[in-house]
Amino acid sequence: MDASDWDERYAGADLVWSAGPNVWVRELCSPLTPGRALDVAAGEGRNAIWLVEQGWTVTAADFSPVAVSRIRDLAATRLDEDALRRLEAVVADATQPAPGTAYDLVLFSYLHLVREEWHRAVAAGVEAVAVGGRVLVVGHAQGNLTEGVGGPQDAAILLDPEDVLASVAGLPVAVELAQLRARDVEGEPRPALDTVVLLRRTEDAPAR
């Protein structure tokens, strides 16, 4: 789907995604000391707004202008004036250099791209994070197609933990966590299967 497709999807519903943060984002980001965060392909901003509520200063980026407008609208209903100053919503392509650098956290939550585009996106994310900062990748796993629920139905854009690790091979990161996890989905008889990978930037060198 291109930006216009997502514009149409976001324009046609009150909320495409839930208003609360992803369960894995909440679990893994809650222990982190708030700093500067970049939410890549932020959608309607559910994770970005939650991060702001936890004390982070967040850039929420999406290539859909309608999604970016949704982020601003949702933030206005959830955040006070001081918190709103810590949220910037921008139109940006995940496969291009990130909007800004030296982030303490770069988040990829259910960003599914063909492999070449994914490699560009994750390399840009690693380059944008400060030494000691984290890159968190959450997405639908390959097994979700046959054993899970929801998510894209195209195996070419789904990532298992080992696929994420292969995509960052040679980049200056250390692996803190790489797991396949089951996520309960309300109203569904079986869980969704998610890939969850947490990386830490290890050296001050450009991503390659």
Can you name each region flagged by the protein language model?
Residues 1-32, 143:
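Conserved class I S-adenosyl-L-methionine
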Residues 38, 44-95:
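Class I SAM-dependent methyltransferase SAM/SAH-binding core
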Residues 132-140:
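Conserved beta-strand signature within the Rossmann-like core of class I S-adenosyl-L-methionine
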Residues 156-176:
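Short alpha-helix
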Residues 113-125:
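A short, conserved alpha-helix within the catalytic core of class I
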Residues 113, 139-145, 181:
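Short "lid" loop at the C-terminus of a central beta-strand within the Rossmann-like core
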Residues 97-105:
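A short acidic, Gly/Pro-enriched loop at the edge of an enzyme's catalytic core
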Residues 184-208:
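Core SAM-dependent methyltransferase catalytic element
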